[in-house]
């Protein structure tokens, strides 16, 4: 007789291109995409994020936050922080993260050092949010595959406002 319960399902997706950040998958992961924009750089900025239900393009939430003055990289970090905080607040435990900033992706994963002092505190804040999750992996994607988060950040810069939109399941 098998020691494994017949209804036990092992949740484990291949991590093609993802950098492992924390833990093991305990459930199907949600997908978080983030972005940041500054116009000009530095100048009025916004960070934004969208969280999708596991294996779908159906959003759980989308959020952007206006920043009166920041660099593009600061705005990118703010997009990541916004997404992590909202996902944590929603009780999400398993997370795949995607963004189009190689710098932020690799710094967050720990593969690149943080050389700019203005990014160190944002990096620390983002990493501190990891305590809320069981599993996190992160991946760089091309800008065109990050269109939803990109649209949010551009909306934030244009509207000079901050918005949270929740969607029904």
Task: Name what the model sees in each region.
Residues 1-30, 58-61, 90, 132, ...:
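Intrinsically disordered, low-complexity regions
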Residues 19-24, 67-70, 109-112, 168:
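N-terminal start-of-chain detector that recognizes signal peptides
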Residues 22-74, 85-93:
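RNase H-like nuclease fold core
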Residues 37-41, 81-153, 163:
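RNase H catalytic domain
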Residues 50-54, 114-117, 158:
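A glycine- and small-aliphatic-rich helix-loop capping segment at beta-alpha/alpha-beta transitions
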Residues 61-66, 80-83, 126-130, 168-169:
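Short C-terminal domain-edge/linker segments immediately following a structured domain
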Residues 75-79:
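Loop-to-helix element that buttresses phosphate recognition and phosphoryl-transfer chemistry
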């Amino acid at each position: 007789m098998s020691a494994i319960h017949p209804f036990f399902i092992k949740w484990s997706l291949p991590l093609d291109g993802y950098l492992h950040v924390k833990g093991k998958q305990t459930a199907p992961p949600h997908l978080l995409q983030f972005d940041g924009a500054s116009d000009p750089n530095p100048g009025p900025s916004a960070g934004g994020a969208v969280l999708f239900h596991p294996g779908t393009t159906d959003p759980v939430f989308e959020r952007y936050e206006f920043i009166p003055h920041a660099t593009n990289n600061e705005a990118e970090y703010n997009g990541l922080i916004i997404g992590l905080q909202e996902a944590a607040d929603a009780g999400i435990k398993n997370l795949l993260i995607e963004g189009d900033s190689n710098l932020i992706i690799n710094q967050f994963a720990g593969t690149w050092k943080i050389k700019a002092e203005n990014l160190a505190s944002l990096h620390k804040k983002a990493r501190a949010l990891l305590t809320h999750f069981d599993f996190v992996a992160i991946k760089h994607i091309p800008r065109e595959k990050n269109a939803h988060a990109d649209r949010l950040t551009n909306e934030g810069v244009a509207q000079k406002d901050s918005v949270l939109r929740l969607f029904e399941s």
